[in-house]
Amino acid sequence: MNSNFNLSFTRFCVPLCLIIIFISSCEAQKLPVKELSIEREGRLIATVKAEIAESQEEKSKGLMHRKNLPEGEGMLFVYEHDQIMSFWMLNTIIPLSIAFISYDGKIIDIKDMYPNNKNSVTSSRSVRYALEVPQGWFTNVGVKTGDLVIIK
């Protein structure tokens, strides 16, 4: 009887431990963080601490499943070439604003995005970067299209 209990216990615990290990490895990876300055006519408007997403895997995951994103923080999506960009909010549970940024750091568009929305938000022209922040942050700190993003 005792050996049956041990066998049943082992059959239960081993899969449970494997599931726990898998889930914990799926939690938010820490990406490199850089401080970005946003300027207008040489004057500092705001700074944001942005996680830098460069690999395809990092960009695909983005801010999915995050429960919060503090004010003044965000994620910068970096691409090798200029392109029309489209983002959607599948599995993203926090409202975000996105700035589409040209190769030289100029903000081309700022748009709001809504949780779990499958509709794409698209840049109006080819850009090199996209910066996601908490929804309304750009407006709240006075950032506008035409402002310059500088990566420190």
What are these regions (language model features)?
Residues 5, 23-24, 53:
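A general, composition-driven signal for non-globular sequence regions
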Residues 6, 19, 80-81:
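Intrinsically disordered, low-complexity regions enriched in Ser/Pro/Gly/Gln/His and often acidic
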Residues 2-4, 18, 145:
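Intrinsically disordered, low-complexity peptide-like regions
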